[in-house]
């Protein structure tokens, strides 16, 4: 959806090296050019990210900050702040793909990159599939109102809607307060 909304053929997307192979396949479908950003045990390296931003002038930065796929690394707190700051400094959209944030059962729970976004450059995407119902293909987006409306317009123009039954079940799951007990299992 983010690609449909923001990516044009030839646009550069900075990605962690390595990154989730299906994301690269989606970016390829939109004829974007992926450029890898180096990582270490604390996730992507901000100095390399800034260097690549200056060299490549990307349209988007794609990052999986928590339990990164395929490495399993988690982006440190300081680096989460740095990503948000660099996005604002260079006016680059960050797609924060954070489907695994709610399956942390030990260690420090870190705020998303979106938490440090003061300029609207970060779009955070999460998933209910990992915590509620695998295969339900339900997710959510956290972004400013203008971005949300743009994404809704693009989704409406390209896909009538996601199946209603999983949406209703997920809504009831949260409305009835089932999530806290489920999350602690």
Say what each PLM segment does.
Residues 42, 93, 141:
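Residues that recognize and position ribonucleotide moieties
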Residues 37, 68-71, 154, 158, ...:
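Conserved short-loop catalytic and cofactor-binding motifs
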Residues 64, 98-100, 128:
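Short strand-turn motif at the edge of the Rossmann-like AdoMet-binding core
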Residues 1-90, 102-103, 108-116:
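Conserved core of the PLP fold type I
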Residues 10, 59, 179-185:
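Short, intrinsically disordered, charge-balanced linker/junction segments flanking boundaries
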Residues 118-184:
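Conserved core segment of the aminotransferase class I/II
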């Amino acid at each position: 959806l983010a690609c449909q909304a923001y990516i044009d053929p030839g646009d550069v997307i900075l990605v962690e090296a390595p990154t989730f192979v299906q994301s690269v396949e989606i970016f390829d479908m939109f004829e974007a050019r992926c450029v890898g950003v180096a990582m270490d045990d604390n996730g992507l390296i901000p100095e390399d990210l800034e260097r690549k931003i200056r060299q490549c002038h990307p349209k988007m930065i794609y990052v999986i900050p928590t339990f990164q796929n395929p490495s399993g690394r988690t982006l440190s707190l300081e680096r989460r702040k740095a990503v948000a700051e660099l996005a604002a400094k260079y006016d680059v959209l960050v797609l924060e793909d954070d489907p695994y944030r709610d399956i942390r059962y030990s260690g420090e729970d870190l705020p998303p990159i979106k938490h440090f976004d003061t300029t609207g450059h970060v779009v955070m995407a999460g998933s209910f599939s990992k915590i509620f119902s695998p295969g339900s293909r339900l997710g959510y987006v956290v972004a400013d109102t203008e971005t949300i409306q743009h994404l809704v317009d693009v989704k409406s123009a390209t896909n009538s809607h996601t199946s209603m039954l999983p949406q209703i079940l997920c809504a009831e799951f949260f409305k009835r307060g089932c999530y806290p007990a489920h999350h602690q299992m």
